[in-house]
């Protein structure tokens, strides 16, 4: 394997998107020896913090014979990744057996949520935005998605993002432990009978991971 180079993650990046741009599957990059410290600190290859360094092999080289008097197009093949989400309301009631339409970077998918309100769809590892419509009539819900923008759980911005998606927070995801963020943390802590610290402490992180999934 060619010598590794370091890629500095930006907002919206994950190991899968970084790997795909260099012609590799995410597992090849994630399991690379050069990412041992990253695996220890982040645990989840799909949740990075801007500034994280990801060791990546050099792009694969390949030779093709082509006439010189013509234009040629080469397409980089990438392995799709699984997008998974469970849809519930404030009372934890699932949006079960509901039709949905998911659009990701211009590609449309249709299906039905399962009995627990879940849906799964393979998407491009470099996808950035999506639009999800679930249900019809009075049960219709719309969600605007940004892939790769969730920060690690042990950061304030990571807690804000999860609290936002769970319906406890409607402010900016800015990494500031301000009054609005503390209020959202307190509401979440009270609902699940945690110590009301108004901080993103370990017990709160564990419960957020349980409720959110990562």
Residue ranges of each PLM-predicted region?
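Primarily a LysM-type cell-wall glycan-binding module
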Residues: 1-23, 78-83, 153-157, 161-162, ...
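Beta-strand-rich domain onsets/edges
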Residues: 6, 61-81
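Short, acidic Ser/Thr/Gly-rich low-complexity loop/linker segments typical of extracellular
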Residues: 10, 107-116
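Extracellular LysM carbohydrate-binding repeats and other cell-envelope/extracellular binding modules
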Residues: 24-67, 190-214
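Structural motif
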Residues: 73-95, 166-168
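Acidic, Ser/Thr/Pro/Gly-enriched interdomain connector segments
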Residues: 89-91, 121, 127-176
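Short, ordered, surface-exposed loop/turn motifs in non-cytosolic proteins
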Residues: 92-105
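Glycine-centered loop-to-beta-strand initiation motif
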Residues: 113-120, 181, 204
């Amino acid at each position: 394997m060619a010598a590794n180079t370091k890629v500095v993650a930006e907002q919206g990046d994950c190991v899968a998107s970084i790997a795909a741009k260099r012609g590799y599957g995410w597992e090849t990059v994630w399991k690379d020896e050069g990412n041992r410290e990253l695996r220890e600190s982040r645990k989840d290859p799909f949740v990075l913090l801007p500034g994280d360094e990801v060791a990546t092999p050099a792009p694969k080289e390949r030779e093709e014979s082509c006439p010189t008097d013509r234009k040629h197009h080469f397409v980089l093949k990438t392995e799709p990744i699984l997008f998974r989400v469970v849809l519930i309301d404030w009372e934890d009631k699932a949006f079960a057996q509901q039709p949905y339409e998911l659009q990701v970077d211009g590609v449309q998918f249709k299906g039905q949520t399962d009995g627990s309100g879940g849906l799964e769809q393979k998407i491009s590892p470099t996808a950035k935005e999506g639009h999800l419509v679930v249900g019809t009539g009075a049960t219709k819900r719309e969600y605007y998605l940004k892939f790769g923008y969730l920060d690690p759980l042990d950061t304030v911005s990571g807690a804000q993002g999860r609290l936002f998606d769970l319906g406890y927070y409607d402010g900016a995801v800015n990494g500031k432990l301000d009054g609005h963020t503390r209020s959202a943390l307190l509401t979440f802590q009270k609902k699940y009978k945690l110590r009301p610290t108004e901080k993103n402490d370990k017990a709160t992180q564990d419960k957020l991971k349980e409720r959110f999934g990562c």
